[in-house]
Protein backbone atom coordinates (compact mmCIF):
# COMPACT_ATOMS: atom_id res chain seq x y z
CA UNK A 1 0.00 0.00 0.00
CA UNK A 2 1.33 3.42 -0.96
CA UNK A 3 1.73 5.79 1.93
CA UNK A 4 -0.12 9.07 1.82
CA UNK A 5 3.15 10.89 2.52
CA UNK A 6 4.67 9.35 -0.62
CA UNK A 7 1.76 10.58 -2.73
CA UNK A 8 1.96 14.04 -1.17
CA UNK A 9 5.70 14.18 -1.82
CA UNK A 10 5.16 13.18 -5.45
CA UNK A 11 2.47 15.81 -5.96
CA UNK A 12 4.69 18.45 -4.35
CA UNK A 13 7.58 17.50 -6.65
CA UNK A 14 5.37 17.77 -9.73
CA UNK A 15 4.00 21.11 -8.58
CA UNK A 16 7.49 22.44 -7.97
CA UNK A 17 8.60 21.63 -11.51
CA UNK A 18 5.51 23.02 -13.21
CA UNK A 19 5.79 26.56 -14.50
CA UNK A 20 3.47 29.15 -13.08
CA UNK A 21 1.07 30.42 -15.69
CA UNK A 22 -0.92 33.59 -15.89
CA UNK A 23 -3.84 34.34 -18.19
CA UNK A 24 -4.04 37.97 -19.24
CA UNK A 25 -6.06 40.06 -21.66
CA UNK A 26 -4.28 40.81 -24.93
CA UNK A 27 -4.36 44.49 -23.99
CA UNK A 28 -2.68 43.97 -20.61
CA UNK A 29 0.46 46.07 -20.25
CA UNK A 30 2.57 43.01 -19.36
CA UNK A 31 1.54 41.38 -22.64
CA UNK A 32 2.26 44.61 -24.49
CA UNK A 33 5.73 44.83 -22.96
CA UNK A 34 6.57 41.30 -24.08
CA UNK A 35 5.26 42.09 -27.57
CA UNK A 36 7.23 45.33 -27.71
CA UNK A 37 10.37 43.58 -26.48
CA UNK A 38 10.10 41.09 -29.35
CA UNK A 39 9.34 43.95 -31.75
CA UNK A 40 12.39 45.98 -30.68
CA UNK A 41 14.62 42.90 -30.93
CA UNK A 42 13.25 42.18 -34.41
CA UNK A 43 13.88 45.77 -35.53
CA UNK A 44 17.46 45.50 -34.27
CA UNK A 45 17.97 42.23 -36.13
CA UNK A 46 16.35 43.43 -39.38
CA UNK A 47 16.92 47.18 -39.32
CA UNK A 48 17.33 47.57 -43.11
CA UNK A 49 14.02 45.80 -43.69
CA UNK A 50 12.25 48.16 -41.28
CA UNK A 51 13.88 51.20 -42.92
CA UNK A 52 12.67 49.99 -46.33
CA UNK A 53 9.18 49.42 -44.97
CA UNK A 54 9.06 52.87 -43.41
CA UNK A 55 10.31 54.50 -46.63
CA UNK A 56 7.53 52.74 -48.56
CA UNK A 57 4.92 53.67 -45.92
CA UNK A 58 5.79 57.18 -44.72
CA UNK A 59 2.45 57.63 -42.97
CA UNK A 60 3.22 54.74 -40.62
CA UNK A 61 4.46 56.50 -37.52
CA UNK A 62 6.04 55.03 -34.42
CA UNK A 63 6.27 56.42 -30.90
CA UNK A 64 9.64 58.01 -30.17
CA UNK A 65 10.07 55.42 -27.39
CA UNK A 66 10.45 52.69 -30.03
CA UNK A 67 13.38 54.45 -31.73
CA UNK A 68 14.98 55.14 -28.35
CA UNK A 69 14.62 51.48 -27.36
CA UNK A 70 16.05 50.24 -30.66
CA UNK A 71 19.20 52.32 -30.35
CA UNK A 72 19.62 52.05 -26.57
CA UNK A 73 21.15 48.66 -25.96
CA UNK A 74 20.53 48.72 -22.21
CA UNK A 75 17.30 47.90 -20.44
CA UNK A 76 14.61 49.51 -22.55
CA UNK A 77 11.43 48.03 -21.07
CA UNK A 78 10.75 51.01 -18.83
CA UNK A 79 10.84 53.25 -21.92
CA UNK A 80 7.98 51.30 -23.47
CA UNK A 81 5.43 51.53 -20.68
CA UNK A 82 2.45 53.68 -21.45
CA UNK A 83 2.20 52.95 -25.18
CA UNK A 84 -1.49 52.34 -25.84
CA UNK A 85 -2.46 48.70 -26.54
CA UNK A 86 -4.14 49.62 -29.85
CA UNK A 87 -0.95 51.37 -30.97
CA UNK A 88 1.11 48.30 -30.03
CA UNK A 89 -1.20 46.09 -32.08
CA UNK A 90 -1.15 48.47 -35.05
CA UNK A 91 2.66 48.62 -35.14
CA UNK A 92 3.27 44.93 -34.70
CA UNK A 93 0.59 43.62 -37.05
CA UNK A 94 1.20 46.35 -39.63
CA UNK A 95 4.37 44.85 -41.06
CA UNK A 96 4.27 42.16 -43.77
CA UNK A 97 6.40 39.75 -41.72
CA UNK A 98 4.06 39.77 -38.70
CA UNK A 99 2.63 36.28 -39.37
CA UNK A 100 5.88 34.67 -40.42
CA UNK A 101 8.28 36.17 -37.91
CA UNK A 102 6.77 38.34 -35.18
CA UNK A 103 3.70 36.31 -34.23
CA UNK A 104 5.65 33.07 -33.59
CA UNK A 105 8.35 34.96 -31.66
CA UNK A 106 5.74 36.75 -29.53
CA UNK A 107 3.91 33.48 -28.81
CA UNK A 108 7.18 31.87 -27.79
CA UNK A 109 8.18 34.78 -25.54
CA UNK A 110 4.78 34.87 -23.84
CA UNK A 111 4.84 31.11 -23.31
CA UNK A 112 8.38 31.28 -21.92
CA UNK A 113 7.15 33.87 -19.41
CA UNK A 114 4.18 31.68 -18.49
CA UNK A 115 1.68 34.12 -20.00
CA UNK A 116 -1.35 33.02 -21.96
CA UNK A 117 -3.68 35.56 -23.51
CA UNK A 118 -7.42 35.81 -23.97
CA UNK A 119 -9.30 38.09 -26.33
CA UNK A 120 -10.43 41.38 -24.85
Swiss-Prot record:
| The keyword Transmembrane helix belongs to this UniProt entry's keyword annotation | yes
MF-aspect GO terms: structural constituent of cell wall
PROSITE patterns on file? SRP1_TIP1
Protein keywords: Membrane, Transmembrane, Transmembrane helix
Keyword Membrane included in the entry's annotation: yes
Stored InterPro entries? SRP1_TIP1, Yeast_SRP1/TIP1_CWP
Family note: Belongs to the SRP1/TIP1 family. Seripauperin subfamily.
Protein name stated in the entry:
Seripauperin-12
Amino acid sequence: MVKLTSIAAGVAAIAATASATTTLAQSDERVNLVELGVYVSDIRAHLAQYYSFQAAHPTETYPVEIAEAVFNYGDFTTMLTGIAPDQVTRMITGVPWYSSRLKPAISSALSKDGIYTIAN
